[in-house]
Every structure is written in structure tokens, then in C-alpha cells.
Amino acid sequence: MEAFSVRFESASSIEERKEQTRNARAEVLRQAKHNFEKEQRGEERKRLRDEDTWMLPDVHERIEQFSQEHSEKKKKKKDKHSKKVKKEKKKKRKKQKCQKQSESTDSSASSEDEWVEAAPSQISDKEKTWKVKDKRTEEECDSHDIQRDEWMTIDFMSIKTVSSSSLKAEKETLRQIEREKTQVLEQSKLLERELNPYWKDGGTGLPSKTCILPVTKAKGVEDGGLSWLRKSCQRMKEQAQKENRNFEDIVAEKYGSMEIFQSKLKEAEKIAYKKEDCGWERWRKPTYSDRAQCSQASGTSDLVKCKNLSEDRHLEMEPANSSNYKFSGPDTGKRSGTLQTCRRESALRKNQDSSGNLRSKFLRPSDEDELSFHKRKNFESSSSYSPLVAQASLHCDFRKLTENSEESSASCSRSDRRQENRKPSDKKPLETWSYNANQHSTGGRREQLQAESMSCDPPGRGLQQDMTLTIAGPEAESTYILNVDEKNKLGAKIIKAEMMGNMELAEQLKAQLKEANKFKETQMPAKRLGVEHEDEQEVILIQTDKSGRMWPVSSPRETLDMKAERRKRKRVSTHEDKERVRYFPDDDHLSLKDLVKNEKIGTDINQNRLFMKMASKFMGKSDEDNYTLDDMFVSKAAEKEHLGKKEESQRRRAIAEHQSLAAKMAKCLYCFDSSQFPKHLIVAIGVKVYLCLPSFQSLTEGHCFIVPLQHHQAATVLDEDVWEEIQMFRKSLVKMFEDKELDCIFLETNMGLKKHYHMVYECIPLPKEVGDMAPIYFKKAIMESDEEWSMNKKLIDLSSKDIRKSVPRGLPYFAVDFGLQGGFAHIIEDQYRFPHYFGKEIIGGMLDLEPRLWRKGIRESFEDQRKKSLQFAQWWKPYDITKSKSS
């Protein structure tokens, strides 16, 4: 036979590969930290240089003027509102007075007929009734009766004063508390998703020394010192590993030689196994306990190698009081059944033992992995048991009681004594198992629930006792959130327990389910705190077409039926008496006005999308000449659509469009609300438009931008007032450069309509000689640009009409104007091949400039930008149209 070649890998190569990954991670972290610190330093430098706050003084005054106008408008609105409220209050008061007067007149009219005795006036003897009191005495009496208000009698010197520093300190404490709350919420979310057990519950990432529970070993009784010798072997092995010595030398120091130690072990094994022989005949089939003895004898023969007995691990959880749950004795009537069940159980335990090792590698780590890590690491792995083994060992515990229970229990107890590492309590092993399961995480609890479900099968007294042991101690058991499957399993166990008559178990399981539900209710609000703090925005959803027209999206008239999605669409009758009555199911509900409105609102994109959807679904169903494409569309149109599906799809599309537009505007370089907007480059602010300078190095001295305040994409979609103000800025710029004996060119490039770029109208000054030759250069470049065979006219003359009247809305274009004269326009056929720097490239060629100036632009420092803006502001001051407007 050919030997199969196995590829081995040395430990040094594995360690080297790990070291490389560690170094790579460290390098990535170092680079990220370096970049972050660099950004922080840059922001700090900007803050120190006032890059974010510095503006031209004229611009600052203009912004303050805008804010004052805005505040005055708000005040006027408030005054109007307050006046309305006052008028309403006056009306209410008048009504109330009228009602009171009417009530008083009614009461006086009714009380005229009644007689009332007057109270006798107590007048002193000195004073006569006919004498009139002096005014002074009346004033004195009034002064004695009137009391001052409480705030007038307060000693203001005793009032505690509040300083600005104390207010700042209080605000800082409140902010600190809010930060701590947010950190706690974030930490709780991270802890829920944490897979490493050593990071959970505030861990350090490394196993703590206290997490290893001290495990006391059960003493073997009447085993001839076998357990003691095994423990001694284990300790000698550990000593040899710690001191890096030979195992045989340590054995020779303690026992004289290895042969003496092996002879003692053999004698102890003989004494231990001699008592297990029950005088059974050789021809009889071996029972479960016999097979356990054989497996143990074969496992202990090679104790020098210190290997654990994997065959005996399924007996570690056997209860010491197994007299209640017995294997059948030597009765011939009951022997065959017990032998078959024991065989099944032993095979099942072996399978679970072998699968448990593999399964543990692919399970999500839980809290109980902390203990299993140390148990697998040391030689004490035999003392640890997995929940699967514990579950398997419980199969033999829950059995019917037999007559010869004592004989079978003796064999089970002897097999338990042979285990070298056991839990401390021999009397209540199930109780210890439930305690460990409660101590650990959800994995142990799920296994406990499985054990409870197994316990519900056979009724009996011993069954109820063990069930109380496994379920006992709900106080010590920490509740956790159950998922849907676990709740279903728990409900099935409750029903099963009620059917078997075990009401105590059913009540306990119900209480457990109730506690889990309560725990879930208390935990869910804490998780939603972060969502509640988020600001909700109320937005009018709009739909925009290519031409820039916008209209609000109508809310669904009928709620979307989710169940109807799964049903087949119903066919609507389209013909009556062999005549076509309708094409679509909603033809009866739509008037001619509605149809015209839908046709105007609908875009070519929607029609193409609908066409592609229908064609892709039914292209395979065409039957050559019998079932053509037209028939397919006609039959599809006759099917009734689901309720509200069309409106819901439009709403979803509008929400996605709004979100993408908001994200683009947040990063826009020319929007006032953007965080990246360079305020120090603004020169003048109008009503709808502002004038600014480029953030990169200018092509020529005086290079500037005319930009609308609102986020518009192109000149073809602008309103009339915005376009008029742009033309006013254009005229003043032309006049300014004419006085300096310069000519100027205005450029606009509208590309990438889906990306929602901000419209920029560039003004580039040129010398007079170059400016006179510019129309020839641009005309030739436009004729040679783009596709050879174009769908639209290549060169559009703008001398008689401006760009808004020459190019339809929604088309990408390039436009150039020469001073106050007209210019040329070109509709872009292929946006991917047409360069965005087309106009600047032509000017760069005319002036013989470096390509890097007009390709991406060279960055400028803040000082250079400030000098540039101050110089341009001096040029612009005599021609500023914003000041003339404001004055």
C-alpha cells in the first residue's frame, strides 16, 4: 500500500506566523493612532489660528444683519400671536362678566321677596352714630390692616449668591453624569455581544486565579489505596513538569523504584476489582457494570503515562444513593430488558463523549468556559464533566424500581468508587450538578432544562425527589432572557408535567417562565434608551425627476396587506360582450384629470423600471407566435395589484432619496449648514447667492465662485430670483475686472446628476489679448470633444438665449460665457468620458499653466487663503452690490 503523505507543521513556524500577525496588528494600530493624533493636532492648530471662526469683517456684519432680521421676524410673529391670545382672553372675560351679571340679576330678582335679619352693629358709647369719622383715622386703620408681601420682607443679604463658575461646575457635573450613563449603556451593549468569557462582567481579558473553584476529591472506600496511589501519580507528574525533571527519578525518590510503585498499583487494583466479582457465570452476557469494570481495568494498566480514562467519564455523575434507581438483578425475567437498555445507554454515552470534544470547539464561549479552560489544561481533566455527559448519565438514574435493588445498587456504587475525581458531596450528586449549572451561564441552564424534560417521562417517588433537587434553589439561579425556542420547550415541559400529574414541577416551571418574562420586560426599556434619545425628524417626503421638478409623495390610501403578498393576484374582467371595457383594474376609479396628472408626474425612469420588471418576469413564458410580448403586457396589466403596494414603494424610494441627499449636503463644501464649509473664503453674501474664493490655488489672480445659498444642482433648475441675482454679481465682477484691464470667463459644468453636486458658477479673469481669442479656442475644443456621433447638437450658441432657455432640464451640460456677451453650451453625451475640468483645461492651455493646477488643484495654507480673501475684498469693496442693496 502506498503511504499517504501527511504534511506536518512545526511549532516554530506556527509561532512565527502568529508573531507576524501580531506585528501586523500592532503596526495597523500604531498607524491608526498616528493618523488620529495628526488629525487632532491639525484641528488644534486650526482652532488656535481661528480658521473655523475667522471671517471678513463685512461678511461678519452681513451675517449679524441677517440674524437680526430673522429675530425681528420671529418677534413680529410672536407679537401677532400674543395679540391674538390677548384678544381671545378679553373676549372670554367679557363673556364671563356678562354671564356673571346675568346670574346676579337673576339671583337679585329672586331674593327681593325674602327677608334677612341685619346683624346688630356694635358701636361704642363714646361714638355717636351721627358723627362722621375723620379721614386720618380711616387711613391709620387701613395702614394697620394692610400687610406687606413675603418677598418684600425678605433680607436680601442673607440670600446665597450664585457665580458663573458655580453654574459652570453644575453644568459640568450634569454633563459628566450624562457621559457616564451613555458609557454604561454602551458597555452593557458590548458585554451582551462579547464572546470572550474573560472580558465579560468587567473582566481583564485573562483568567483570574479566583475563578478556579477548589474541587475536593471523593475518598475511595475499600479500594486497597488505589485512589491514593493514582493521586500520588498525578502529583509526581505535575512535579516533574514544574521542575523539568524525569518522572522516573521522582518516583524513585518517593518509592525506591518504578517497579515497586507499579507493583503497589497492581496489588491495589487486584484488591479493588476482587470485590466486584459477584460470582456470575462465564457464559452469561456481561452487564453494564461488568463492561465498566473491564474498561477501567484496561485504562489503569498504563498509569505511568498518566492518561485519563475516557471510557469511565460517563460514570462521574452517577448518584451515590443509587439504591433508588437500580439496574435489574439476576432475575431471568427482567435481565434481558435491562441488558438491552444498558447497552443502549453505554453506546449513547460513548457517542456523546466523543461528540462532546468536537462540539466544544465550535460552540460559542460562555461563562462556564472559564472553568473548562483550566480543567482541560491540567491533568485534572478527569474531574471535569460536560453537561452532555451529565445529561447522559441521568438516563440510568430515572428508572423504575425493581425488586432486587440492593444487588444492582452495590455494583453501581462500586463503579462510582472507582472514579478518581468526583464532586464533594457523595450523597447528593444531582444537587451538586444543579448548583454548578446554576453558577454558569445559559449553556448550563439549557442542559438543566433538558434534564428536567427527561425527568417528566416516568412517574415515581424517586423521580419527584430528584426533580426537586434539579429545580431547587430558584433564588440562587440567576434569571436570563429566554429565546422563542426555549420558551416553547419550557411550555412543552409544563404541559407534559401536568399530564403526568406532577403539579409541583409544573408550578416551578411556570414560575421560571414568569420570572424570565419579567426579566425581559425590565431589560428591554434599558436597551431602548439610546433609541429614545435620538431626535426624530419630521420630513415632507418629495419625489424629484431629472428636470428638477418636485412634488410631495402621497400617503398610502390603504394599508399594505402583507399576507396578500403571498396570494395570487386576481384577474379583472377586461371585456364585456366581446368589447374591451378596461385595461387596468383601477380604470373605473380614475378620471381623465387623474390620468393626465399621473402622466405628467410619472418619469421615464419609472416607466423603464416597470417595463424591465414585467419583461424579466414573463419573457420565458412567451409561446412563439401564439403568445407575443404585447399579449404578455396586456394580461399582466389586467391583474389586480396588492393594496397600497405602489404607494408604499414610492414612499420607500422617497425616504432613501431624502437620506442620500441629506448625507451629501452634510459633506457639501458650499452649503452653509455643512461642517466642512470654509467661512474664511466668503467675500460677500447676497439674498440668495454668495461670492467666495476657491480653497485650492487659483488659476489666475481674482479667480472666484458665484454660488447659490440653497443646494441647487444646475442653472437650468434655478428660480428666477436666484438667476437674476447671479447675473447681478456677474455684471459687477465684469465691471471690476474691466477697470483693472482684464477680461473674464464664466464656466459651469453640470455632471453626475445622481450625486447631487452643488452648482458653482466660476469666474476666471484673463488678460485682454487672451480673452479676445478665448471664443475661438472654446468653439474648437467643444466641436472636437465627446462622442463623434452625438444625439444632441454639439455646439449651442448662447448669444441670443441664456442657458436656461437653450438646454432642457435634467440634461448634463457644459456652458461658457465671455464677459457680458453670450457664449457656448454643449450637452454631455457620455458623462464618464467627459472631464470635469474641461473648461479649466482649455484656459490652462491658453495661459500655459501646469496641469496639476486645473486637474485636482494645489492645496493652500490658511495664511495664504486669508491673504487672498483680504486682497479680493479690497478689490470688491467699491463694486459690492450687497451694500448698495442694504443701504
Swiss-Prot record:
**Which residue ranges have biased composition labelled Polar residues?**
433-442
- Basic residues bias: start-end ranges: 73-98
Indicate, by first and last residue, each region the UniProt record lists as having compositional bias (Basic and acidic residues).
Answer: 14-72, 124-143, 342-352, 414-430
Q: What domain of life does the UniProt record list for this protein's source?
A: Eukaryota
Chain intervals with Low complexity compositional bias: 99-110
Q: Where is this region: Disordered?
A: 1-143, 315-370, 405-447
What are the coiled-coil residue ranges?
11-103, 164-254, 495-524
The UniProt record lists the Glycyl lysine isopeptide (Lys-Gly) (interchain with G-Cter in SUMO2) crosslink at 168, 597
What's in the keyword line of the UniProt record? Coiled coil, Isopeptide bond, Phosphoprotein, Ubl conjugation
Using the record's annotations, give every residue carrying the modification Phosphoserine: 71, 354, 366, 478, 622
Q: Name one Pfam family in it.
A: CwfJ_C_1
Q: Which SUPFAM superfamilies match?
A: HIT-like
Instruction: Give the family per the record.
Output: Belongs to the CWF19 family.
Q: Output the PANTHER family linked to this UniProt entry.
A: CWF19, CELL CYCLE CONTROL PROTEIN, CWF19-LIKE PROTEIN 2
- Name listed for the protein in its UniProt record: CWF19-like protein 2
Q: Its gene?
A: Cwf19l2
